[in-house]
Amino acid sequence: MAAKEYYGVALLKNTRGAMAVEDGAKKKGMAVRIIPTPSTIYASCGFSLKYELTEEETLKELLQELGLSVDGFYHAEKTGLSVSYEKV
């Protein structure tokens, strides 16, 4: 049986915002990376931020510090090649 992986996806409003959040998060030592927005969620700007669920509150605080907002937060569950998303 395939192991399950859980992570968060934050949908950013624009590419510049995605890059600013990624840069700020990495400076804080967070494990984040820009990914293409999964088509099953929403198109948005085309880029999202993948993050560890344990860092969700820290990410929200960083967004507030930077004066940026998101189109939504999702929790992902990946089993093998299958990924499901739940909006939070």
Show where each model-derived region lies.
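A short, terminal or domain-edge coil/loop segment
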Residues: 1, 24-32, 84-88
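Solvent-exposed alpha-helices and their adjacent loops that cap or buttress functional pockets
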Residues: 1-4, 41
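Short glycine-/aliphatic-rich beta-strand segments at the starts of folded cytosolic domains
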Residues: 4-11
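A generic structural signal for well-ordered coil/turn residues at beta-strand boundaries
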Residues: 6, 43-45, 69-70
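Short, flexible beta-strand-to-coil junctions
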Residues: 11-14, 77-79
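Short N-terminal helix-initiation segments at or just after the protein's N-terminus
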Residues: 13-19, 84-88
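Amphipathic, hydrophobic secondary-structure cores in small proteins
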Residues: 13-15, 22-64
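C-terminal structural segments of small proteins and small subunits
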Residues: 56-88
